[in-house]
Amino acid sequence: QAAVCDAGRAPEDCAERVLTLADGVFDKISEEKSPQGVICVAKDIDKCKKIATIYSEGKIPPARETVVLLESVRDPSNIGAIIRSAAAIGVDRLILSGDCADVYNAKAVRASMGTLFGQQIDRVGDLPGVIRQLRESGRRVFAAALDSGAERLGDFPVEVGDCVIIGNEGHGLSDAVLSAAD
């Protein structure tokens, strides 16, 4: 259902309800200090798909796609900024672990500056499993990690279809993800 604090009319092709709300009620359901006057409430989709489900739905990234994987990125503003940056550099798809922040959180949507709605984003329950499947399909998957023996991005050729994993803000990447990557 959608809530509109303006004219109280739904577009003619809208099948859902439109409600006019008192300012106090509107302020209670909005996370914004100065909302724009329109709020959409929608049912959330399945946030955590198993890799087998993604494969059966044909959503494994084609080899030509540039992919960024995120593990346990918890701050919604960081998720939004990563989505925005990924769009700016031509990333085709983002794959998020199930415990990443909600991409539809108001802070994530705002930080993405609208690019969220043009990006292909998948959320998976078994990120190491996805990484293994990507590697088995011939793709290289690089882990962005602070390690004295790590190679710097730019010190080696990046090819079409290569993938990069970015980890949690405080803890980086898990051992399971690091061991699954190249």
Feature map (PLM): residue ranges:
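Gly/Ser/Thr-rich helix-start
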Residues: 38, 81, 115, 168-173
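Active-site/ligand-binding-proximal alpha/beta "capping" segment
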Residues: 142-182
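Short connector loops at helix/strand junctions that flank enzyme active sites
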Residues: 33-35, 63-65, 159-160
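RNA substrate-binding interface of SAM-dependent RNA methyltransferases
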Residues: 1, 5, 19, 24, ...
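Structured helix-beta-strand junction loops
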Residues: 14-16, 137-138, 180
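Short, hinge-like loop/turn segments at secondary-structure boundaries
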Residues: 38, 111-115, 159-162
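Glycine/small-residue-rich loop that forms an oxyanion/phosphate-binding "nest" at active or ligand-binding sites
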Residues: 10-43
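Short, conserved catalytic or adaptor-binding loops enriched in Gly and charged residues
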Residues: 10-13, 111-115, 177-178
